[in-house]
């Protein structure tokens, strides 16, 4: 019996282990961590004849596995995986494993620094409104291998794909791929901007059809010279399209130009989307592009867009208390996303920011803080460094409050004092200093806000 080793006991790792077991592999699933939750998972998976090793880091002292499958959170270049590849052990990511089981189906792959979750969710909603079984998976919704485990295969697979997942997927080739934005992020893992770009570009190069956000500064700069056959989008109108085919906003409508010589066609009114911000119009254009390239009719697109509620943790309206809106933008884990968050809400804002800082250019974000906020509450490891940056630009109305509990309590007082209509959690940071992920951070913010309203 062939032996497989799955690294990482998260949702993706467990789904990969179950899929391999179903296919007849002898499976070991390992995680370097230990906890009561993981011990419980270990016991449950033992009933399925899946061995789980906790507190274990991959080594090659014993019999070598035939296959190693890596969860998205595990760096591709850790010494153990580098050695595995040197030893000739086939090493792939969980997304690649799912692709190998589902490649007979059409995929839409969505990647990008920011905007991919909203775009993925909206594409899935549109395809489902058109009558397709089209689950969102990957970095959102189901693990890709969970979709592969389903008794009945779907019609389409709508996959949000991080750079981590693309890096470990060697043959993944969606029918349609979308690149939402590109700015410095995850450089601690990918080292250089060029390497980060090349990883994401691989997904698009291996796809049949490509869609790009033409309003993104970096993507538009490399534009048609790199991607001459792609479809481009622009919220600014037809004159701003790169190339001669794509999707754009004109007179309040999403308009398609599928071929250079075809007549432009109105697809859906831009106001049908309830989500605020120019960035969400960009997301709308890319979602409509995917739908039209899959021959979905405008009436299904219109229905889905009008009913689309938005995405948790991305400018999510939690509640209104004494005329103050509390908004959860926990998914803003870098400066660009946080800048967009500030630009998308009413001002002046009481901003809650901080966490585990990432490399990047903070100048535009700081300028937005100066123009849009009445006060800034700083939490997490980044608080002292952020305070220093605010001092350097002459902004003094900040407080280091350290925890989310203190930030939410203090935000109400400050909002009343400054007559600010919005309290916004938009951290510009990863969450790992205080929370396991940005979802847990956003959930905690939501809980605290609702407790405040109920008190």
From Swiss-Prot:
Do the record's keywords include Cytoplasm? yes
Q: List locations, semicolon-separated.
A: Cytoplasm
State which Enzyme Commission number(s) the record gives.
6.3.2.9
Entry's Gene Ontology BP terms? cell division; cell wall organization; peptidoglycan biosynthetic process; regulation of cell shape
| Keywords from the named record | ATP-binding, Cell cycle, Cell division, Cell shape, Cell wall biogenesis/degradation, Cytoplasm, Ligase, Nucleotide-binding, Peptidoglycan synthesis
Report the catalytic activity. Answer: UDP-N-acetyl-alpha-D-muramoyl-L-alanine + D-glutamate + ATP = UDP-N-acetyl-alpha-D-muramoyl-L-alanyl-D-glutamate + ADP + phosphate + H(+)
- Give the residues the record marks as binding ATP: 112-118
Keyword Secreted listed? The answer is no
Q: In which pathway does it act?
A: Cell wall biogenesis; peptidoglycan biosynthesis
| Molecular functions per Gene Ontology | ATP binding; UDP-N-acetylmuramoylalanine-D-glutamate ligase activity
* Cited Gene3D superfamilies: Mur ligase, C-terminal domain (3.90.190.20), Mur-like, catalytic domain (3.40.1190.10), NAD(P)-binding Rossmann-like Domain (3.40.50.720)
One annotated Gene Ontology cellular component of this protein? cytoplasm
NCBIfam families (alphabetical): murD
> What role does this protein play?
Cell wall formation. Catalyzes the addition of glutamate to the nucleotide precursor UDP-N-acetylmuramoyl-L-alanine (UMA).
Family the UniProt entry places it in: Belongs to the MurCDEF family.
State what protein this is by name: UDP-N-acetylmuramoylalanine--D-glutamate ligase
